[in-house]
Amino acid sequence: MVVIWGGNYSVIKRAFLEIPPQPFNAIRMALAACVFLITIRLAQRRARATRGRMSPIFYTPFPLTRRDRIDLFWLGLVGHWMYQLFFVGGVARTSVSNGALIIGATPVAIATVSALLGREAIGILHWIGAAVSITGIYLVIGRGASFGGATLGGDLLVMISVVCWTTYTLGAAHLIKRHSPLYVTGMTMAIGAVPYALLALPQIIATNWAAVSAWTWTALVLSALLALCLSYLIWYIAVQRIGPARTSLYSNLVPIVAIAVAAIWLEEPLTPVKLTGAGLVLAGVFLSRLGRKMTVPEPGPEQSGG
């Protein structure tokens, strides 16, 4: 998951040279949604054939409640439509390393919101870590990327996407105690893909698809299957088993992979300020982890409704 998401920044950045960001992502999301819906249907058929003897990753027998349906709807809008809208729009307007480093503050955001919701008790080290991470982000988008310059708008859009992803991760945590990660991820993806495609429709029609190279088509398909389908599913399998706070820690390595790939492939410069900012973001996340003390145990596999 870490390697896929880290490399995906450069993949989509390169693809944007041939396909505008929103049409690219609309097609990517539609493809991922179709794959998810087909897989969910196959899992349901398999469950009936085996009388429900399947891994809770793919199927759980609990019926959807009215609250579940409402949650799936708004999580689809926030976690897929809005998140992808801001994330892709931001990456298109900033550097790969800037975007990845800002996303790297997600664990701190998730821990902070968890504390505000009463799910975690936050110690002084967490707040120190949050301050250190914010300082690192400032170095990246403030000094490292010429604050007020060409990348500022993109940096701010990526920051908004962090808010959307934090909301999505924490908001879906209770759903995957009753329903499989496959179902929750797939249904929210399908729900979010619809308004995204409608919003991007004028650009989709205006795009010269005949001029798109085979490389970019391959990148689009692989990004849909790996960065959206596989990685999203892995993310929520982890959330189901170890909880959102611990799962978010694995995203700490995404900026490192993204910066390395961008430096090698896209030849983005690794400035001292950017490297310092990266170090501060990671150090802040580490301090945040040390300062967290869970007030309630996070659900393990035996608590996940399987």
What is each stretch, according to the model?
Residues N25-I27, Q84, N98-A105, G171-V194, ...:
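Helix-helix packing/entry segments at the starts of transmembrane helices
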Residues V35-R41, P63, T106-A131, I256-T276:
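C-terminal transmembrane-helix exit sites in multi-pass transporters
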Residues R48-P61, R292-G306:
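Intrinsic disorder in cytosolic terminal tails and internal cytosolic loops
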